[in-house]
Amino acid sequence: MKFIEVHTDGSCLGNPGPGGWAALLRYNGREKELAGGEAVSTNNRMELMAAIMALETLTEPCQIVLHTDSQYVRQGITEWMPGWVRRNWKTAGGDPVKNRELWERLHAATQRHRIDWRWVKGHNGDPDNERVDVLARNQAIAQRDGLATS
């Protein structure tokens, strides 16, 4: 099983507002950057999209260490998801889970991989986190300025 290191981030100019996401995948000394955005989104949606797109890009089962500065993503997938599924996509308080379609997509994308979800403090000097932060922010700016290609 291949070992892949993944770094993800999402960005939003306003919340909601133009959004961008980015992922850096590292395998055997090689790197691949992924990035995209939406004209109107939220920061949480962009954080989810970064993880989804990184995992959906992989064509075979992998051992992954996924670094995110989003507690929402890390806790959602590692702690909250089982309860949401048991309660038919309701929170502990009985409300519908926000971004359900993205959570379902992320859940599906995780099934064939072994993933170690790691939280990294954002804007704290981690070079890979800073790199994906810049990529995601540039995508959000491109969305805002009408320059987006994705």
Swiss-Prot record:
Entry superkingdom: Bacteria
Catalytic activity: Endonucleolytic cleavage to 5'-phosphomonoester
Species of origin: Xanthomonas euvesicatoria pv. vesicatoria (strain 85-10) (Xanthomonas campestris pv. vesicatoria)
Annotated compartments: Cytoplasm
Co-factor: note: Binds 1 Mg(2+) ion per subunit. May bind a second metal ion at a regulatory site, or after substrate binding.
Binding site for Mg(2+) 2: D9, D133
Keyword flag Magnesium: yes
Documented EC number(s): 3.1.26.4
Protein name: Ribonuclease H
The keyword Lyase belongs to this UniProt entry's keyword annotation: no
Gene3D superfamilies: Ribonuclease H-like superfamily/Ribonuclease H
Quaternary structure note: Monomer.
Swiss-Prot/TrEMBL cofactor(s): Mg(2+)
Binding site for Mg(2+) 1: D9, E47, D69
Swiss-Prot/TrEMBL keywords: Cytoplasm, Endonuclease, Hydrolase, Magnesium, Metal-binding, Nuclease
Domain RNase H type-1 residues, every copy: 1-141
GO terms classed as biological process: DNA replication, removal of RNA primer
Summary of the function given for this chain in its UniProt record: Endonuclease that specifically degrades the RNA of RNA-DNA hybrids.
Family as reported in the entry's similarity comment: Belongs to the RNase H family.
Any one GO MF annotation of this record: nucleic acid binding
Record-level GO cellular component terms: cytoplasm
Stored PROSITE patterns: RNASE_H_1
